[in-house]
Amino acid sequence: MATSWGAVFMLIIACVGSTVFYREQQTWFEGVFLSSMCPINVSAGTFYGIMFDAGSTGTRIHVYTFVQKTAGQLPFLEGEIFDSVKPGLSAFVDQPKQGAETVQELLEVAKDSIPRSHWERTPVVLKATAGLRLLPEQKAQALLLEVEEIFKNSPFLVPDGSVSIMDGSYEGILAWVTVNFLTGQLHGRGQETVGTLDLGGASTQITFLPQFEKTLEQTPRGYLTSFEMFNSTFKLYTHSYLGFGLKAARLATLGALEAKGTDGHTFRSACLPRWLEAEWIFGGVKYQYGGNQEGEMGFEPCYAEVLRVVQGKLHQPEEVRGSAFYAFSYYYDRAADTHLIDYEKGGVLKVEDFERKAREVCDNLGSFSSGSPFLCMDLTYITALLKDGFGFADGTLLQLTKKVNNIETGWALGATFHLLQSLGITS
């Protein structure tokens, strides 16, 4: 039964609080959806979807379970199994078979999670993001072909185009849709939505629904996209900035992106402890890096280095200064690493909180003893990206989250529903 976008995404909301895979028993969206709506512990048709997220820093598998009570009725999202491996496929740029073996490892998770009787009708798809976008096309395709062979030799349903590199803007749209449906923002007649900020290793995305005509008029061509849902048309501002992910920004800050070679050269920064001499591998390339043995060190000189990476490089829609945004991925991780938020629960921060923590970490590099040596640089980059890149105000509130109602944030769930819609799959 192929369904419309509106029907498909109704699946996301209806039954997230009480699931097979998560223990929390709670009524979500009180007054809108009740826990009694969830078809748990009933005789129901069950079907599954497998979505691989091949990011720059790791490969993740999402196994979603859906139930359908009766034919002709919309199915419900019942739960998610999530696992991951590191490093990402791009680290195997010259060993594509080894890269594909990491996917095979995760595919065993799907076999363990899905009954054998459902294997041949469960679709499996891998979508690669910025890590593979940055590779030479021939090398990226070699990796994808090896993964495709793994899929073809699996017991699962392998649709056409099952292994591909996803467009960055599409990534942002699906993450926005997922978050806003899981938070119940798109279920009334109004359009009280939240924006989304995703910071990966190699790219970053910003997506929101503009409320002011001025934003639509002043936005560059290619930053706006429309889609229809619930008999409404949503015109989103969305853009993916390749090379502005957290780890790609480290290379840019160190000056390693412009370097013709890395052998024998140590890249230095005021964002690193003065005594530091270390190696770092990203995208299959090994870099030597260290602190400034002579010269300045701390937040101010670090900020000056990072500012060169972002200033004047990103579009700044004025509207974001007063908008509500959900932020995840490395925004969440670095906030949790520095105790700005609870690691499990997340929390709400102001943009200025990232700057405060960056100053605290960077101005104490002399006593740095544990954790990531890049912590000062990462926090400073996040601060500069939000303020000088996107143009957020110091007081702009950000909801930092890893999961919404026990489901991973990001684009994977939205992509799975789109996949099921295109294949016409129900129970």
UniProtKB/Swiss-Prot annotation:
Signal sequence extent: 1-24
Location relative to the cell: Endoplasmic reticulum; Secreted
Inducers of expression: Expressed in response to phosphoinositide 3-kinase (PI3K) signaling. Activation of PI3K results in FOXO phosphorylation by AKT1 and loss of ENTPD5 transcriptional repression. Up-regulated in PTEN-deficient cells.
Disulfide pairings: 271-302, 362-376
Reactions that this protein is recorded to catalyse: a ribonucleoside 5'-diphosphate + H2O = a ribonucleoside 5'-phosphate + phosphate + H(+); GDP + H2O = GMP + phosphate + H(+); UDP + H2O = UMP + phosphate + H(+); IDP + H2O = IMP + phosphate + H(+)
GO molecular function per UniProt: ADP phosphatase activity; CDP phosphatase activity; GDP phosphatase activity; IDP phosphatase activity; UDP phosphatase activity
Keywords of this entry: Calcium, Disulfide bond, Endoplasmic reticulum, Glycoprotein, Hydrolase, Magnesium, Secreted, Signal
Keyword check for Secreted: yes
GO cellular component: endoplasmic reticulum; extracellular space
Main location: endoplasmic reticulum
Tissue expression summary: Ubiquitous.
InterPro entries, sorted: GDA1_CD39_NTPase
Active site: residue positions: 171
Pfam family, one: GDA1_CD39
GO terms under biological process: 'de novo' post-translational protein folding; protein N-linked glycosylation; UDP catabolic process; UDP-alpha-D-glucose metabolic process
Free-text description of this protein's post-translational modifications in UniProt: N-glycosylated; high-mannose type.
Enzyme Commission number(s): 3.6.1.6
Disruption phenotype: Mice display hepatopathy and aspermia. The hepatopathy is progressive and characterized by centrilobular hepatocyte hypertrophy, oval cell proliferation, bile staining of Kupffer cells, and hepatocyte degeneration with increasing incidence and severity of degenerative lesions, development of multiple foci of cellular alteration, and hepatocellular neoplasia with age.
Essential cofactor(s): Ca(2+); Mg(2+)
Record has Nucleus as a keyword: no
pH dependence: Optimum pH is 7.
Pathway assigned to this chain's UniProt record: Protein modification; protein glycosylation
Role of this protein: Hydrolyzes nucleoside diphosphates with a preference for GDP, IDP and UDP compared to ADP and CDP. In the lumen of the endoplasmic reticulum, hydrolyzes UDP that acts as an end-product feedback inhibitor of the UDP-Glc:glycoprotein glucosyltransferases. UMP can be transported back by an UDP-sugar antiporter to the cytosol where it is consumed to regenerate UDP-glucose. Therefore, it positively regulates protein reglucosylation by clearing UDP from the ER lumen and by promoting the regeneration of UDP-glucose.
Homology family: Belongs to the GDA1/CD39 NTPase family.
Subunit structure: Monomer; active form. Homodimer; disulfide-linked. Homodimers are enzymatically inactive.
Official protein name in the record: Ectonucleoside triphosphate diphosphohydrolase 5
Provenance organism: Mus musculus (Mouse)
